């Protein structure tokens, strides 16, 4: 690989060990595995009507027609989990009930995608702005602070970060990167760099920053009292962003990236460590971050909560509240208390 940054010419590429990684795409005959046969649209309905796989949905003739059209454009495998997310599996629910849960999940995905996108853009902006102003050196310009090994927790994390950044810029098709490469001799200001980094790269960059720099950035953006929690909140936001980008499920999901929460919040909202993998806690983390965003975005978040409450109220018989970590006070916990800016 040819590295983008001139200061990085002598970096040794970090090679990931492959021996212990599982091998996917195995041929079924080679491993004695029986593969399922493809099903027809009508057979999807038959499966959903039966009890063998825990679906047990009822279908009217109209619902059969709706379902056949639906499965022409939506993967049955993706939908098949939703009947199992209805509150009581002993009860007989309709296809419409399961479809409504599916639609609620789509609503959640759209909203969460919007807000995590706002968070991603904001974090990138704040990192570029504050680090370039905090940084002081006689060796590197403020705009290229990320090139300084002293900015990182170790030489190893510095080298790995430079490799990651260099790869991102080499893959870029953006004219402004080409401009800086050809017209600026490859000198990239941090506010240009962050535009080409993924949320994951920025998240990782923050995690390997020298503690003093990271704390100064965090204190300026979120306040000193949140210093211990911010990185985990951002990691959760990044995780939720990825879920939405891949059109994966939010409703009834057990999340695998868990946040650090304030003890007083956990006590006030009745959250236990066992609840940290729920939708409610995921939304609580987004609310915690967005409480430091603009008044406009905070208002949009509260409107999201109003709409979510209306959806829950209209579908209370099919919403599985415990599965998603929601308690009676869920809305008050997730609303942002908006404090107008004093212009005096």
Where do the PLM segments sit?
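Extended intrinsically disordered or low-complexity regions, especially N/C-terminal cytosolic tails and loops
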Residues: 1-239, 251-344
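Acidic/aromatic/glycine-rich contiguous surface patches that form carbohydrate-binding/processing clefts
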Residues: 247
């Amino acid at each position: 690989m040819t590295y983008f940054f001139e200061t990085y010419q002598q970096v040794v590429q970090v090679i990931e060990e492959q021996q212990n990684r599982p091998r996917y795409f195995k041929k079924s005959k080679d491993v004695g595995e029986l593969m399922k046969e493809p099903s027809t649209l009508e057979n999807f309905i038959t499966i959903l009507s039966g009890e063998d796989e825990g679906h047990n949905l009822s279908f009217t003739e109209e619902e059969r027609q709706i379902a056949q059209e639906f499965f022409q454009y939506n993967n049955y495998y993706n939908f098949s989990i939703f009947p199992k997310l209805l509150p009581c599996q002993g009860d007989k629910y309709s296809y419409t009930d399961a479809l409504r849960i599916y639609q609620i999940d789509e609503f959640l995905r759209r909203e969460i995608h919007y807000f995590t996108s706002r968070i991603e853009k904001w974090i990138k902006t704040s990192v570029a702005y504050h680090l370039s102003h905090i940084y002081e050196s006689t060796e590197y310009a403020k705009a290229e602070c990320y090139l300084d090994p002293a900015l990182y927790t170790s030489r190893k994390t510095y080298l790995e970060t430079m490799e990651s950044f260099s790869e991102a810029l080499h893959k870029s098709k953006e004219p402004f990167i080409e401009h800086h490469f050809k017209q600026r001799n490859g000198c990239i200001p941090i506010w240009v760099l962050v535009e080409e980094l993924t949320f994951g790269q920025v998240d990782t960059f923050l995690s390997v920053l020298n503690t003093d720099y990271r704390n100064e950035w965090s204190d300026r953006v979120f306040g000193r009292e949140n210093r211990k929690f911010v990185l985990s909140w951002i990691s959760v936001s990044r995780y939720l962003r990825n879920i939405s980008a891949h059109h994966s499920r939010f409703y009834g999901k057990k999340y695998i990236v868990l946040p650090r929460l304030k003890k007083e919040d956990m006590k006030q909202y009745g959250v236990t460590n066992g609840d940290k993998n729920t939708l409610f806690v995921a939304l609580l983390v987004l609310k915690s971050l967005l409480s430091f965003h603009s008044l406009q975005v905070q208002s949009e978040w509260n409107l999201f909560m109003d709409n979510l409450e209306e959806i829950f109220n209209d579908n209370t018989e099919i919403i599985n509240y415990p599965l998603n970590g929601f308690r009676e006070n869920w809305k008050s916990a997730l609303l942002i208390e908006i404090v107008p800016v004093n212009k005096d």
